[in-house]
Each structure stands twice: as C-alpha cells, then as structure tokens.
Amino acid sequence: MNVKIEQSWRKYLVPEFEKPYFKQLVEFIKNEYASKIIYPKGNKIFSAFDKTPLDRVKVVILGQDPYHEPGQANGLCFSVNEGIPLPPSLQNIYKEVKDDIGIVSSTSGNLERWSEQGVLLLNATLTVQAHKAGSHQKKGWEKFTDAIIHIILKEKQHIVFILWGTYAQKKGAFIPSDKHLILKSAHPSPFSANKGFFGSKPFSKTNDYLKKTGQTVITW
C-alpha cells in the first residue's frame, strides 16, 4: 500500500501498512474525508513524522486526538496553525515553559519549531470529525501509533517520553523506564493543570536528561 510518509519512517512502517487493520483504517479515513469535514487537512495527517524524522527523535510528547474546531489541527499534538488563538491547554503549556525555564513562548501556537528539533508531537489518533472530539478513536489509529512507539523503542536510545494525563500514561505504560526518561504529570487542560501539571518542570527535566546523555537540548 502506497502511503505518503517521511522516508526514514516508511522503511520501518511498510509491514504495518500491509496489515488488515491498517487497510481498513485507510478505507474508513478515505470515506470520512469524502463525506464529512475532517481535521487536519489530508496532507497534514502525517505531519508529525514529516517534521521529525526517526533519526532525529529525542523527545516524544503523547497527545490524544487532533483539535476538532476549524483551522486548528495541523498534525502535531497540542499545536495549532499560525494565526489561530492559543487553545487553553497550549496556553498552560506555555505558562509552564515560562515558569520552568524562564522562556516567554512565541505568540504563535504552531509547534513546528519543537518538531524540527527532534520533539515528536504524536497524537494517539491522527484524525477527527469536525466538532466531534474522539470521533475517530478505536478505528485503528491507536494500533498504528503504538507501532510508532515500538519502532522508537527498538531503534533509539535515551528518549524522553512526556505523558500528560491518564490517557497518555495508559498508552505509554509499556515503555521501559530503565532505558528512557518517562515524565508523567496531570494534563495541561484547565480541568487538571492545577492538579500536578503546573510545577512539574518537564522542559528543564527533559533538557537535563538530554545533556546527561550527550544530546543537544531543546530550545523550547
């Protein structure tokens, strides 16, 4: 099956593309895009991989599914397109960046600048129907993104996995903590940010670990 995805990932994903579940997922997604408003745009579904080739991955931030309002989703978890107001979770992420490492983040919510430094911004589900949060869950995306994590674990050393909230922590439960750094906290959503996200210092902890393991730090 010919799936347009960045070359360094494709090499490892070819067997995945041939599995029955993935073929069913592709048919489902094609039909959804043909008949409904789906986010992100079709050419942005695999943006996380295009912006962060496998050989450059140093950090993985796990999200749940894309933003479901017009113009927001751009294929990177927590990120929005240029010119779009910052969603509440991203406002809280930027607040923690400032409190943690003293950097005032850009007014832009586009996190490509993180991706290009080796931060894989990976949603568990890569598409969503407009105005319907979670509408494409349990269609096969979760299995695919689990395969992505397994590829990283097999091919990479000393990765920082940032797991915000219960959903991400359950999804990442199989990641071995003796070989990688796993940072867990509450989700940056306004409903939970005060329950352990604020003050968790994930950005400085990430950079400390990257330094310790001989990797270049992220300019958050």
Curated annotation (Swiss-Prot):
<dbReference type="InterPro" id="IPR005122">
    <property type="entry name" value="Uracil-DNA_glycosylase-like"/>
</dbReference>
<dbReference type="Pfam" id="PF03167">
    <property type="entry name" value="UDG"/>
</dbReference>
<dbReference type="GO" id="GO:0097510">
    <property type="term" value="P:base-excision repair, AP site formation via deaminated base removal"/>
</dbReference>
<keyword id="KW-0227">DNA damage</keyword>
<dbReference type="InterPro" id="IPR002043">
    <property type="entry name" value="UDG_fam1"/>
</dbReference>
<keyword id="KW-0234">DNA repair</keyword>
<comment type="similarity">
    <text>Belongs to the uracil-DNA glycosylase (UDG) superfamily. UNG family.</text>
</comment>
<dbReference type="InterPro" id="IPR036895">
    <property type="entry name" value="Uracil-DNA_glycosylase-like_sf"/>
</dbReference>
<protein>
    <recommendedName>
        <fullName>Uracil-DNA glycosylase</fullName>
        <ecNumber>3.2.2.27</ecNumber>
    </recommendedName>
</protein>
<keyword id="KW-0378">Hydrolase</keyword>
<feature type="active site" description="Proton acceptor">
    <location>
        <position position="65"/>
    </location>
</feature>
<keyword id="KW-0963">Cytoplasm</keyword>
<dbReference type="InterPro" id="IPR018085">
    <property type="entry name" value="Ura-DNA_Glyclase_AS"/>
</dbReference>
<comment type="function">
    <text>Excises uracil residues from the DNA which can arise as a result of misincorporation of dUMP residues by DNA polymerase or due to deamination of cytosine.</text>
</comment>
<dbReference type="GO" id="GO:0005737">
    <property type="term" value="C:cytoplasm"/>
</dbReference>
<dbReference type="GO" id="GO:0004844">
    <property type="term" value="F:uracil DNA N-glycosylase activity"/>
</dbReference>
